[in-house]
A protein has these predicted regions:
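Beta-propeller blade termini and top-face loops
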Residues: 24-570
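Bacterial N-terminal signal peptides that target proteins for export
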Residues: 1-9
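Bacterial N-terminal signal peptides
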Residues: 8-18
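Bacterial Sec-dependent signal peptides at the C-terminal "C-region" and cleavage site
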Residues: 16-26
Length: 570
């Protein structure tokens, strides 16, 4: 008869210990200590170099977050994955960086307090797990109470990657933070955190395991006691059985996992969630359901009874993120009409009938500064819907910030923000020299080392741009003896040589010899360069290394398969 009492005592002790530990937040990150050391060294150095922006602005970079201030028309915030939070107060004609000199440049999410929009919550650390390349980590949560003029770090330093911040609709000091955690290791600090005192203390209110982070969280505006959240098993891969949808009915203190028709297989991926502004029982999720054909993984489900049962809203497949749902899975509802749904992926899927049918947003695109792109850029990261005017949208994607005042019939591209995520840069031998670089999904560009004047377009130009207004530029460099000959590459080993005078390029990607047994494999960003000893000689490498003596017109295989062990028994 004493065993149940003993068991209850043990469980109570475990739970109490967890609550105490959660209240203490997280341990300090070594990244923050490194930043503090850097600040000390910089302040004591006699060589404090001042940096100036030289561009480019014609292409922009991946805008991870966009948020508007409904109380101040014309005020918009845009956060970029590779760096900084920018603010405009004139509908995007001019922008100012407002997150300078902080311990992290990479940003995962930004949220304005609905009841006090000058209070801004910011989560650092890029919120997407790129299996193929570097992802910038963060140093916790920051808060500003003056519209971004000053900032305080509020802890959660060991989060590394923050997926979402949600602020209470009437209390700016209550917020939830969805923490992805460390992408490349197990980590006990994954999960959902809550603060009730403006970030002074934190509670770890939803935790699954050290492989599963929290991805998204929404508070029902009509009843803030109702909170929905999603978890994402993001280590070691990008899917798992612990990915799911959760609900709290007491403001986030206790949680239960929802089922009733939702995908729950071993390959459930990233999940986004949106709740009706008027009905806390009506909720939508966008699921990267890798349990089915990966090209058809994007699925929208809806509940009208608070999560007891769910139904897939559409019969036709969406095809908005084939095989790369780890990049997307964000879903939004019109605050005035919960039958109007936006699902983000490579394209924006739009429904006005509760998700039963979807079309793709496109429309004509105009640029603030000259740009040859004619279409809306791909790969959409966040959408803001003006609650006072649902025709007014702002979207952040791999091409930057776009706004529309007619629900996507026409778009304005705000390519007047000097940001870019460069894989690599190089310079030629001219005097003055030109700079070349390949960017993350914003093509290959070149331009002068000249300080940019925000009132004017810069002098940068494209070496190459794909048909969808972007493309990963990777390595870009000029022939050291002929600056009119430029070499550039794009994802997965593609390589080209361009004659700038003629404006023409040719593919020079190497191929394995005919009849050769084996298969060439390439990293997303493939090593590719000119020999420092002979400007005609090129090298290109994947699991095989190739050498060209004639600018890429021909190639010779100079290595075995480097992905295979030289020991036949291994």
């Amino acid at each position: 008869m004493r065993k149940p009492a003993v068991l209850a005592l043990v469980l109570t002790t475990i739970l109490l210990g967890s609550a105490l530990a959660a209240g203490q937040g997280q341990p300090e990150s070594p990244l923050l200590k490194s930043w503090e050391r850097y600040v000390q060294l910089k302040e004591s150095s006699e060589f404090r170099l001042e940096w100036v922006s030289i561009g480019p602005v014609l292409n922009s970079a991946r805008a991870a977050c966009v948020q508007g201030d409904p109380s101040r028309p014309g005020t918009l915030y845009a956060a970029f994955g590779p760096g900084n939070l920018w603010k405009t107060t004139d509908n995007g004609l001019t922008w100012k960086p407002i997150f300078e000199n902080q311990s992290s440049l990479g940003i995962g999410d930004v949220a304005l307090a609905p009841s006090r929009p000058e209070t801004i919550w910011l989560g650092t650390g890029v919120d997407l797990k790129k299996p193929r390349n570097f992802t910038m980590t963060g140093t916790g949560v920051f808060r500003s109470d003056d519209g971004g003029t000053t900032w305080r770090n509020l802890g959660l330093h060991d989060s590394y990657h923050i997926g979402k911040i949600e602020v209470h609709p009437t209390n700016p000091d209550i917020a939830f933070v969805a923490v992805h955690g460390h992408y490349w290791t197990t980590n006990p600090n994954r999960g959902l955190y809550r603060t009730l005192d403006g970030g002074l203390t934190w509670e770890h209110v939803l935790y699954v395991d050290e492989r599963t982070g929290a991805n998204d969280v929404v508070i029902a505006p009509a009843n803030p006691s109702v909170v929905y959240a999603t978890t994402w098993e993001n280590y070691p891969g990008v899917s798992g059985p612990s990915s799911g949808v959760w609900k709290s009915e007491d403001g986030g203190t206790t949680w239960h996992r929802l089922g009733g028709g939702l995908p729950d297989g071993p390959k459930t991926g990233r999940i986004g969630v949106a709740v009706s502004a008027s009905d806390p029982e009506k909720c939508y999720v966008l699921v990267d359901n890798l349990n089915r054909d990966e090209t058809r993984a994007a699925e929208v489900y809806r509940t009208t009874n608070g999560g007891t049962t769910w139904t897939r809203t559409h019969t036709a497949d969406l095809f908005i993120f084939p095989r790369i749902g780890w990049y997307f899975a964000d879903i939004y509802l019109n605050p005035r009409d919960d039958e109007e749904v936006y699902a983000l992926g490579v394209r924006i899927a739009h429904s006005r009938d509760g998700g039963r049918t979807f079309g793709l947003l496109g429309g004509d695109v105009f640029h603030l500064f000259p740009n040859p792109a004619e279409t809306l850029h791909l790969d959409h990261c966040e959408l803001w819907i003006d609650p006072g005017n649902p025709d007014h949208l702002a979207v952040g994607n791999d091409g930057g910030v776009y706004t529309t005042f007619n629900r996507g019939k026409t778009w304005l591209h705000h390519n007047n923000i000097p940001v870019g995520e460069f894989y690599d840069i190089s310079v030629d031998n001219q005097d003055p020299y030109m700079i070349y670089g390949g960017t993350q999904d914003d093509a290959s560009v070149f331009g002068p080392a000249r300080e940019w004047n925000p009132r004017y377009a810069d002098a940068w130009r494209y070496v190459w741009i794909d048909a969808w207004s972007g493309g990963d530029g990777c390595y870009t460099f000029a022939d050291p003896e002929d600056p009119n000959t430029v070499y550039f590459s794009s994802q997965n080993g593609a390589a080209r040589r361009k004659d700038l005078r003629a404006g023409r390029s040719v593919s020079i990607m190497p191929r394995l010899p005919k009849g050769f047994k084996g298969r060439a494999e390439y990293n997303f960003v493939t090593p590719y360069f000119i020999s420092p000893h002979n400007h005609l000689t090129l090298y290109h490498a994947g699991n095989f290394v190739f050498k060209s003596p004639d600018r890429g017109d021909s190639w010779k295989l100079i290595s075995p398969d480097l992905a295979r062990s030289s020991d036949p028994d291994r």
